Amino acid sequence: MSRLAPLSQCLHALRGTFERAIGQAQALDRPVLVAASFEIDPLDPLQVFGAWDDRQTPCLYWEQPELAFFAWGCALELQGHGEQRFARIEENWQLLCADAVVEGPLAPRLCGGFRFDPRGPREEHWQAFADASLMLAGITVLREGERYRVLCQHLAKPGEDALALAAYHCSALLRLRQPARRRPSGPTAGAQGDASAQERRQWEAKVSDAVSSVRQGRFGKVVLARTQARPLGDIEPWQVIEHLRLQHADAQLFACRRGNACFLGASPERLVRIRAGEALTHALAGTIARGGDAQEDARLGQALLDSAKDRHEHQLVVEAIRTALEPFSEVLEIPDAPGLKRLARVQHLNTPIRARLADAGGILRLLQALHPTPAVGGYPRSAALDYIRQHEGMDRGWYAAPLGWLDGEGNGDFLVALRSALLTPGRGYLFAGCGLVGDSEPAHEYRETCLKLSAMREALSAIGGLDEVPLQRGVA
């Protein structure tokens, strides 16, 4: 179908696809994955997010310049736990795809995310977010370039009613163009204060201790993160994304709902993308502010490029990615020196990395090899993670962890969930971190985290959702 057909035609096509899948399920005596996709008229997936998010149904919004989608409803959830979570999901996904019934231009796909560290501390506000949770969404609305599509997915079981399944999905398609629920903005809180003087001193003391550990040779780099917990008004997550879209067009936008909590952000960092056997990633480490004018901006950027401390920190990330990708690659392309990635408030050292993969083994094995890179964990990985578990004093949850999608043809894309916040009823948790090496300065690193927190604070404040007064909670 070139465009979403009239209801009767859509119902007939979906019924036929579901009948094939149910018949195959009966023959195999096990459930069978079914995916049916159609072209539709232009439609912004963000507006569907705004119309459909009911604050309980699992869903995920994702936006980059080349691809945006809203995935709603969980037809199947693949979970993994502990150190083998990536491998377990990969194994189950391959089994499902082997017998899948597919109709239309799109392959079956999963979307979701992972905890930063399954062995790390756990707090109640992250309870709904598993070690690994990738869902087969019932309905996904996509914009890819100039193409707009909808993907219907289900796990067909022997004896199911194909007509009832088709009618259910058609009824959802009829709601695609419902208007988004927009809540009026309350009073804007304006510029948000950061941590108290005592909390700042506590944070800088943690940084100082970590830097001392680097100098003592315990590890070459460690990343410490901190969180701010703030009272939160009654806001629509999609409106936060709408604001981030306007202010941070160069970032990767995401929002993932589990239960009554929504984790969202505007990340500058891709972990890895696979398309047609080619892997694309980058090393992103080393940070400085943007300038007030073009001349100051150029001066600050050059200072970052000339900084021995930041170049050393950056090179640790480059070498870790090289080591992780080499076993999977026929060709690995890494520039000799970094460039700059300029964002709205900060600029980073950035080295793009490409790999021609040796086989079609899938993206989850690359996630396991890459995560966490030294940009969000440290180097060496094991020693840095042990230090974070013992000294950071917070549950990162899905912060700084892989979040994205993969399909049944070996393609996929996962970002690193940075510049983010977890929204729960009545309160929001904002996250930021910084990489520490032997000559890091606590006051400078504190200011860096303030810059990184500012994007999400400003977005929440702009729609009237953030209270000026921090909750009385330690900053880590």
Curated annotation (Swiss-Prot):
Any one Gene Ontology BP term: pyochelin biosynthetic process
Gene3D superfamilies noted in UniProt: Anthranilate synthase
InterPro entries: ADC_synthase, Chorismate_C, IsoChor_synthase
Region (Disordered): 181-202
Keywords: Isomerase
Isomerase recorded as keyword: yes
Group of enzyme by EC: isomerase
Pathway(s) annotated for this protein in UniProt: Siderophore biosynthesis; salicylate biosynthesis
This protein's record includes keyword DNA repair: no
The EC number(s) this enzyme carries: 5.4.4.2
Pfam families documented for this protein: Chorismate_bind
Reaction(s) the record says it catalyses: chorismate = isochorismate
Domain of life, per lineage: Bacteria
One Gene Ontology molecular-function label: isochorismate synthase activity
Protein function: Involved in the conversion of chorismate to salicylate.
Family listed: Belongs to the isochorismate synthase family.
PANTHER family, alphabetized: ISOCHORISMATE SYNTHASE ENTC
The protein, known as: Salicylate biosynthesis isochorismate synthase
Gene: pchA
